[in-house]
Amino acid sequence: LKRRKFLRYNFPLTNYYTYVIKMNNRFNTEVPPLKGSKPIYAKKANLKAKWTYNSKDNINGYTDPISKTKIEMIKNIEKLYILLKKNNIKMSLAVYPWPQTLENDTVDSQHVKMWEEFCLNKCEKFINFFPYFFNEKKESSHLNVLREFYFWNDVHFNKKGNIFLGEKLADVF
């Protein structure tokens, strides 16, 4: 742990490339294959996404109830809002689905509702990307949307996904 902290703070690039090599499936057989018939996400990512589509307040693997966690998230964004307002900076907020959310949730996600409600009378703009992705899913399939817009086995957008989001943001602004 000490070595990792030392590397992280004193040699960030070395630390990053050590991580990349460690996670590269040519060197680590624990990493899922780059392309399978269905993506395999890290357990932590699956757990992190679960609250958005799970109706239970207590989810196995979470330390606190979801209701408490939501309050914490809102408090943190509220602090950001106050800081921005104090500096005369307008706040806009965008929400988009993670792959797990896209697979297991609906366009009217509690995730969307929570941030939309927060943005009332606070945000310059609230940008909801859920309808775009759920529409794409409806027109093709969940897996096709993942292949087209996300890195496989990852919750992040690929180049095409980022271009897609950028074009939608350009339309809004």
Predicted features and spans:
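Serine-dependent acyl-ester chemistry module
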Residues: 1-117, 124, 129-140
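Short glycine/proline- and charge-enriched loop/turn segments
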Residues: 61, 141-152
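Flexible, active-site-adjacent loop/turn segments at secondary-structure boundaries
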Residues: 100, 131, 148-149, 155
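Glycine-rich loops and low-complexity Gly/Arg-rich segments
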Residues: 116-120, 152-154
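Histidine-centered active-site loop/cap adjacent to the catalytic His
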Residues: 149-173
